[in-house]
Amino acid sequence: MRMREAEGVSAERLARIAPVMRAEVDKGTFPGAVSLVARNGRVVHFEASGYLDAAKTRPMTKDAIFRMASMTKPIVSVAAMMLVEQGAMKLNDPISNWLPELKDLKVETAAGDVVPTRPVTVQDLLRHTAGFVYGGSTRSPRIKKMYEDLNIEALEKDITAGDMLKNLGTIPLAHQPGTFWEYSISVDVLGLLLERVTKKNLDVVLREMLIEPLGMKDTTWWVGADKRTRLAETLDSDAQKTGMLKSYRHFDDPAVRTYLKGGAGLLGTAEDYLKFLQMVANGGEYAGRRYLSKKTIEFMLSDHIPGMGGTTAASTGPGYGFGLGFAVRAQDGFAWTAGSKGDVMWAGAWGTSFWIDPKENLVGIMMSQAPSNRVQTRMLFKNLVYAAVVE
């Protein structure tokens, strides 16, 4: 019996992925993609489809480098929990312990700005319940304008970490801390907090704690000239391409910047990201080295937002809550794809996505650069993979 069947995955059904990916290339969904599936810690599917470049002249390769955007967030979240395990901070610590620029935050209400009922905590940053927002998605016109005017997200021009925090401290929160889930800059703020805790730049923190020990050799904040030919591109026809390229400036050496976004800054390969995800799927251990305890991983992959307002559905579809750095399937029904209660996922705005299914010991990664079609592609790939799980 071949390995694929031995891992309870049908080789015949996995073979459906390649023609579907080719069809998406032909339809103009993306130039190309890399898809990877592991079951029981073994790779059962790893394919490159289509092309690296927008002109469709260079074949996609398995070692292609992708802008991962928000798939940076789980890595920063794991680093934060490693520091919690080391006693450097606690989840219920106010973030102002390290970020005094944010000690006088107010909360926007219909009756005016009010004092928060409690401080924003480290846990709030990890689970997006701090009251911070993304300017493009918040329902508050006032907060949206303030984020834009004060360059909080550094979308088209850089800002120093100090100025970002100083400016953020003047903007009210959209919700009382710990009451409402709203996708936000929280992990950008968490990255700055990690810098204060460790007294190191965020790129150094992640490199020392996770990237180098895991052997993620192509995971980086910027693409040097020697690897630029491996960078996957977006079709010129993608309506979001121009704006996204302005917002994600990955050809700049981070040494000249003081604000590295913990929520969106990394690039990497599918194979690199599998090492990180497999460590999480293994309960915090990879290749003989322990990064987090089994119980900490279980805690991170639990739903931390029951009873709160807000929903993750725009990114996950229905049926998901949110843990510490990961969306968590809260129940077996309602979701748009097959899966298991307790499976976790997240994705990136450029078109990358992943999930971990602890019950099935299954990890899936889809790497493409198709911001306008990102939800469609992540659901399509997930359906194809679960259709191949037969034991």
Which sequence ranges carry the predicted segments?
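Short, conserved phosphate/pyrophosphate- and ester-handling motifs at nucleotide-, phospho-/glycolipid
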Residues: 10, 73, 269
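Short clusters of small/polar residues that mark proteolytic maturation junctions
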Residues: 48-50, 94, 368
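Short, surface-exposed loop or secondary-structure junction motifs
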Residues: 103-339
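Short, surface-exposed beta-strand/loop micro-motifs that present aromatic residues
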Residues: 343-345, 350-359
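Short, well-ordered beta-strand elements
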Residues: 354-355, 361-370
